[in-house]
Amino acid sequence: MSRRRRAVKREILPDPKFGDIVITRFMNALMYDGKKSVAEGIVYGALDVLKKRGGNQADPVRMFHEALDNVKPAVEVRSRRVGGATYQVPVEVRADRRQALAIRWIIDASRKRGEHTMEERLSNELLDAVHNRGSAVKKREDTHRMAEANKAFSHYRW
């Protein structure tokens, strides 16, 4: 067990445009070198593109949350050493980690895409995630497949 105290969760303020805390978390994860205004511009630009693509009555925040929900993993594998052998043990993912992983995977998948601007890449990745395709969704499927393949070791859970 850790001897240190549990770290206090910092309160994150909702973003100024939509009033959504998850979007702020997304911006913070996207940000490089403390350049929040750049990250803000990218996210808001991508959400504007989502609004245009989905028709004017489409709600970009709802689409964003739908994309995030489609990428969130339910289970993952963790390494566990038992008697000299290392087993990949499937474990259920906590809600806060689920969200963090989904955000990270969407950003990583966006950065690896081939479009010119980050705004385009992010909007296309979010759109793909809404339709259950794209690299981020594939990452979730692979994680679930690994957990399914190692289901036999689930009794080693901790």
Swiss-Prot record:
Q: Name one GO cellular component term.
A: small ribosomal subunit
Among its keywords, does the record have Secreted?
no
The alphabetized list of GO BP terms reads: translation
| Cross-referenced Pfam families | Ribosomal_S7
Question: CDD domains, alphabetically?
Answer: uS7_Bacteria
Keywords in UniProt for this one?
Ribonucleoprotein, Ribosomal protein, RNA-binding, rRNA-binding, tRNA-binding
Write out the similarity annotation.
Belongs to the universal ribosomal protein uS7 family.
Instruction: State what this protein does.
Output: One of the primary rRNA binding proteins, it binds directly to 16S rRNA where it nucleates assembly of the head domain of the 30S subunit. Is located at the subunit interface close to the decoding center, probably blocks exit of the E-site tRNA.
Oligomer status and interactors: Part of the 30S ribosomal subunit. Contacts proteins S9 and S11.
Which protein are we looking at? Small ribosomal subunit protein uS7
* Primary gene name: rpsG
